[in-house]
């Protein structure tokens, strides 16, 4: 279906092209339709606002139809087209993610087997197919690792039994991925502060251990 925009000076501002089967056969027999007559094929597309006959199509004037209805139909058709394209695109991308190289490996193996006519060529074809299969297995394994990985956690707030929102004892932040234990061993620190405290505590314990080892070495020469 084709739509054309005409200026206001013409007798019609919208036209469409439809098939003969969609209209009555009498439309092509110079019969009057809404005060318009079908023109000769040579004069087709030279005048506006009339019914034209050309090959297997006829052009019908929209001068008797409200523009609001026409625009609404066009808008609905465009929305349906975009929705269909998105569905097909998402389906194709999901299939490509599951088996990204299966089609390429299969086509390569088949083409090599068709062109081989001697035993040496057959051996080369099988060798290339084996390489392609191993490459496909490695790629599939790589994609499977991505799909089975744990999703990223989001920050959240915790409401205490008394109705107050829990906050970090160090930075006073209320949003965190998880609560971690600090000096009080009561999970009073947010995730960043808890990780920093753990690293600092680990360094302090390492220094204490090294100092204790030095004292032991001095006492036992």
UniProtKB/Swiss-Prot annotation:
Presence of keyword Zinc-finger: yes
Superkingdom assignment: Eukaryota
GO CC annotations, alphabetized: cytoplasm; nucleus
Region of interest (Disordered), residue spans: 101-121, 137-161, 201-221
Family matches, as SUPFAM superfamilies: Glucocorticoid receptor-like (DNA-binding domain)
Compartments, record wording: Cytoplasm; Nucleus
Transmembrane parts of this sequence: none
Biased composition, class Polar residues, residue ranges: 101-110
Zinc finger (GATA-type): 168-193
One Gene Ontology molecular-function label: zinc ion binding
Record's compositionally biased regions (Basic and acidic residues): 203-221
Keyword annotations: Cytoplasm, DNA-binding, Metal-binding, Nucleus, rRNA processing, Zinc, Zinc-finger
InterPro entries in the record: Znf_GATA (IPR000679), Znf_NHR/GATA (IPR013088)
Biased composition (Basic residues): 142-155
Keyword tRNA-binding part of the UniProt annotation: no
Extra facts: Present with 2100 molecules/cell in log phase SD medium.
Function: Plays a direct or indirect role in pre-rRNA processing.
Protein's name in the database: Pre-rRNA-processing protein SRD1
Organism: Saccharomyces cerevisiae (strain ATCC 204508 / S288c)
Taxonomic classification: Eukaryota, Fungi, Dikarya, Ascomycota, Saccharomycotina
Gene, per the UniProt record: SRD1
């Amino acid at each position: 279906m084709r739509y054309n925009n005409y200026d206001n000076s013409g007798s019609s501002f919208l036209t469409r092209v439809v098939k003969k089967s969609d209209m009555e056969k009498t439309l092509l027999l110079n019969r009057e339709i809404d005060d318009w007559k079908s023109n000769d094929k040579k004069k087709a597309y030279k005048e506006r606002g009339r019914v034209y006959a050309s090959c297997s199509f006829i052009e019908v004037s929209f001068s008797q139809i409200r523009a609001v209805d026409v625009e609404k139909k066009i808008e609905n058709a465009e929305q349906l087209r975009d929705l269909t394209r998105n569905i097909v695109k998402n389906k194709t991308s999901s299939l490509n993610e599951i088996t990204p190289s299966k089609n390429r490996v299969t086509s390569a193996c088949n083409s090599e087997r068709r062109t081989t006519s001697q035993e040496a060529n057959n051996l080369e074809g099988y060798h290339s197919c084996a390489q392609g299969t191993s490459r496909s297995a490695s790629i599939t394994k790589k994609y499977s690792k991505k799909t089975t990985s744990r999703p990223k956690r989001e920050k959240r707030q915790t409401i205490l039994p008394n109705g107050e929102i829990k906050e970090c004892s160090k930075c006073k932040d209320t949003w965190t991925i998880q609560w971690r234990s600090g000096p009080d061993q009561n999970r009073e620190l947010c995730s960043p502060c808890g990780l920093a405290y753990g690293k600092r505590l680990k360094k302090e314990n390492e220094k204490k251990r090294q100092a204790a080892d030095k004292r032991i070495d001095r006492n036992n020469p």
